[in-house]
């Protein structure tokens, strides 16, 4: 009897050692190291650089409104464009402090409502924080104020100097930039403490840092990069009818530059790359979890998309009008990224895509 009991105990111990291990036990990957790299070397520096460009934009706006002249207008446009380009490197991080401050909804709703902007300027009475003004503020609204709709620099300058509502227009411009600066400052400040939360929220649940990051990347790429910057303007969502007025930076005519800055920073984020350093990224995570083939597809498709987007020229709206098929071809390259990004990678890492999408990819 005792011999039989001993055999049973040994058998039970043997079976317990044969239990399937959790995913975290089966595969070895330094998730904490990846989050530290992404947070410390990519996200925080991106916001800090963006804040610096917004500070410069604010100073340039003060200089221009105090003394409106052509050199100051041109300098303001340079500062505006630089801030807009640097925003592209932050837009993907719509979680944590960015979500708390609703950066995307406040900074980059386009096409902007020019009629509403004109009414706000004419009345001199406005509140840019109300929901009804969501499409009359941020970078797209500033784009319209500084460039106008195919109007000369002399005319634009006159709207800030001699026109009936010149004082109101200066006030509106300053209010828009102050709004961007205020929310940028708040977000950068919040990341000072949130970075610890980001680096220590391990695991793969929806609320984990990995879950937030992968969901944010997918939502951004699909809705705001692929569709917003290319698909919608070229007519993918309108039965092939082009909508060139819906390009980003339509009035300043540097839509393709914004697209390229956005896609390049997205590619670097996936690779964990900052500057010339290739740190731990989602690519390494996939390889560690036997997802080398998925990583290879993502790398190749992203690289192909970067090359394709670099063939676009500004003004993108004009290229859409003159050669719609060439822009549709770029969209096709962007589209190839979707399956490995949205389906294969999250499945391999055990991350649930939790945002809603109704366009059928």
Residue ranges and their predicted role:
Residues 20:
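Short, conserved catalytic or interaction motifs in soluble domains
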Residues 23-361:
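Mature extracytoplasmic or organellar-lumen-exposed domains after removal of signal/transit peptides
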Residues 1-4:
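Positively charged n-region of N-terminal signal peptides that target proteins for export
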Residues 14-17:
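C-terminal motif of bacterial Sec signal peptides marking the signal peptidase cleavage site
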Residues 7-12:
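Sec-dependent N-terminal signal peptides
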């Amino acid at each position: 009897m005792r011999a039989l009991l001993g055999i049973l105990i040994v058998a039970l111990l043997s079976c317990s050692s044969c239990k399937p291990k959790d995913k975290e036990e089966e595969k070895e990957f330094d998730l904490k190291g990846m989050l530290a790299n992404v947070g410390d070397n990519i996200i925080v520096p991106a916001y800090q650089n963006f804040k610096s460009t917004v500070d410069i934009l604010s100073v340039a706006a003060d200089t221009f409104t105090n003394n409106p002249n052509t050199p100051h207008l041109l300098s303001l446009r340079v500062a505006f464009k630089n801030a807009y380009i640097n925003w592209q490197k932050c837009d993907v991080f719509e979680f944590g402090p960015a979500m708390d401050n609703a950066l995307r909804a406040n900074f980059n709703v386009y096409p902007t409502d020019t009629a509403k902007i004109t009414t706000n300027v004419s009345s001199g009475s406005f509140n840019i924080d109300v929901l009804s003004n969501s499409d009359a503020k941020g970078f797209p609204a500033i784009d319209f104020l500084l460039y106008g709709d195919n109007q000369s620099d002399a005319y634009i300058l006159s709207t800030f100097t001699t026109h009936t509502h010149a004082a109101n227009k200066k006030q509106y411009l300053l209010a828009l930039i102050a709004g961007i600066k205020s929310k940028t400052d708040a977000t950068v400040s919040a990341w000072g403490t949130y970075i610890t939360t980001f680096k220590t929220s391990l695991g793969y649940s929806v609320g984990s840092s990995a879950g937030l990051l992968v969901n944010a990347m997918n939502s951004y790429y699909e809705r705001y990069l692929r569709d917003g910057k290319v698909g919608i303007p070229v007519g993918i969502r309108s039965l092939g009818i082009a909508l060139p007025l819906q390009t980003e930076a339509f009035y300043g005519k540097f839509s393709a530059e914004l697209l390229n800055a956005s896609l390049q920073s997205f590619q670097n984020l996936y690779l964990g790359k900052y500057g010339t350093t290739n740190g731990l990224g989602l690519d390494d995570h996939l390889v560690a979890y036997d997802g080398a083939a998925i990583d290879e597809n993502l790398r190749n498709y992203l690289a192909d998309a970067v090359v394709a987007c670099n063939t676009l020229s500004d003004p993108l709206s004009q290229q859409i009008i003159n050669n719609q098929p060439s822009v549709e071809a770029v969209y096709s390259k962007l589209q190839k990224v979707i399956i490995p990004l949205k389906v294969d990678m999250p499945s391999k890492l055990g991350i649930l895509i939790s945002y809603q999408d109704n366009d059928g990819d």
